């Protein structure tokens, strides 16, 4: 985007105290999806990535037929990571909130100016599995990263080591069919980083138990709150 617009988006981000804190063994970050609570520019840029022309172009670049954006922002919206924040290696939930569509693409638009590579908070992808080194995709200002989501698309965010805030606008695209023939339904499943054996056992057990719940209750016991409830004003 034009740098001036990207700066406006960055300046429109709310304080982390006005966002939802997600802090556990799995992750430590701030997120928001109820976009009518924030600067209107943020909602505008999120849905700009859902414009039919943009969705079609991204689908063509990624060789995906008929991708569909998610107006509900299920796990999408905005996120902020401050010093000490992190996101452990994980697989994104395989479906949309109603389990009708397959999640196929993750769009991450980074808007923090002057975010140095040494600050951390970067996307890491693990194409050769968690026993091998990840590939780092730096969260540089005004950069859009598009990542495939499937049964083996392990990814993480490196710990933020800088006294600052890395801001991101995120979207997911869905499809009637999965990206690979191996794909099966799964909840968001976390693992630990290499060498963290005890943490890894805990996180794998956590994912196993949550999968067990979803086998009985298709949409889970409680509704995932991370969606944009547009009828809230009605």
State what each model feature region is.
Residues 95-103, 112-234:
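Catalytic core of Fe(II)/2-oxoglutarate
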Residues 47, 67-70, 79-80, 96-101:
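Short, conserved, surface-exposed binding loops centered on an aromatic residue
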Residues 62, 80-97:
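Conserved short histidine dyad/triad with adjacent acidic residue
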Residues 1-61, 232:
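Non-heme Fe(II)/2-oxoglutarate
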Residues 65-75, 119:
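A short coil-to-beta-strand element that immediately follows conserved catalytic motifs
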Residues 13-17, 53, 62-66, 109, ...:
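A generic secondary-structure signal for well-formed alpha-helical elements
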Residues 25-28, 73-80:
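Short, glycine/charge-rich beta-strand/loop segments that flank catalytic centers
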């Amino acid at each position: 985007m034009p740098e001036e617009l990207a700066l406006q988006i960055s300046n429109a981000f709310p304080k982390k105290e006005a966002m939802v804190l997600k802090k556990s063994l799995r992750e430590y970050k701030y997120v928001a999806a109820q976009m009518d609570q924030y600067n209107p520019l943020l909602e505008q840029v999120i849905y700009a990535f859902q414009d039919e022309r943009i969705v079609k172009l991204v689908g063509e670049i990624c060789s995906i037929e008929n991708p569909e954006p998610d107006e509900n922002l299920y796990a999408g919206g905005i996120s902020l990571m401050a010093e000490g924040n992190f996101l452990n290696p994980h697989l994104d939930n395989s479906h949309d909130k109603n389990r009708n569509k397959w999640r196929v693409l993750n769009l991450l638009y980074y808007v923090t100016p002057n975010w140095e590579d040494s600050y951390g908070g970067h996307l890491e992808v693990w194409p050769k599995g968690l026993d091998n080194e990840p590939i780092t995709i730096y969260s540089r200002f005004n950069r859009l990263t598009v990542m495939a989501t499937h049964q083996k698309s392990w990814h993480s965010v490196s710990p933020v080591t800088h006294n600052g805030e890395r801001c991101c606008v995120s979207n997911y695209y869905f499809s009637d069919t999965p990206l690979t023939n191996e794909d099966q339904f799964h909840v968001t499943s976390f693992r630990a980083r290499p060498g963290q054996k005890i943490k890894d056992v805990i996180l794998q057990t956590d994912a196993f138990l949550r999968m067990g719940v979803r086998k009985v209750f298709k949409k889970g016991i409680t509704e995932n709150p991370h969606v944009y409830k547009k009828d809230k004003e009605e």
